Amino acid sequence: MARSFVVGQDEQAWLELNATAFADHPEQGRMTLADLHERQAEAWFDPAGLVLVEDVSGDRPRLVASHWTKREPGSDEGEVYAVAVHPQVQGRGLAGPVTALGIGYLARTGARSISLYVDGDNDRALRTYRRAGFEIAATDVMLAHP
């Protein structure tokens, strides 16, 4: 079942999903409640644009995926900010529909174009986004010296 994020109710469950889904990601997987509150205070944050997907087959709903969108006020561009799928349900075809839910939200709010950033070695995400109609617009490379 899909629904929108509810401020004051969903923070902890979403943080747990995000940490699990992005366990190997240096920034996204380490988001704290304070980090989440900072983003909620941004002008672009809209709880309706943070789509949650719950598994309702058990005794109580369990958050299994989310699609957080971003749209700056006054901009006609939307962003796929973060798509998270719990590892226990990865490979079951959730990423595509979850991505589509967020894209639909952005379209309904008037976004004329949608962008996203993805790690170049994340083949699963790249396949999902290509199937959704995204094309590579730019490639960034980050180098570091030890």
Which residues does each predicted region cover?
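Helical hairpin unit composed of two closely spaced alpha helices linked by a short loop
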Residues: 81-85, 103, 112
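Conserved GNAT acetyl-CoA-binding A-motif
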Residues: 106-117
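A conserved short alpha-helix in the GNAT/GCN5 acetyltransferase fold that borders
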Residues: 90, 99-107
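Conserved active-site alpha-helix within GNAT-family acetyltransferase domains
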Residues: 91-92, 96, 120-138, 146
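A conserved beta-strand-loop-helix scaffold within acyl/acetyltransferase catalytic domains
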Residues: 25-84
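A short, internal acetyl-CoA/4′-phosphopantetheine-binding micro-motif in the GNAT/acyltransferase core
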Residues: 83-90, 119
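A short beta-loop-alpha structural element at the N-terminal edge
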Residues: 1-16
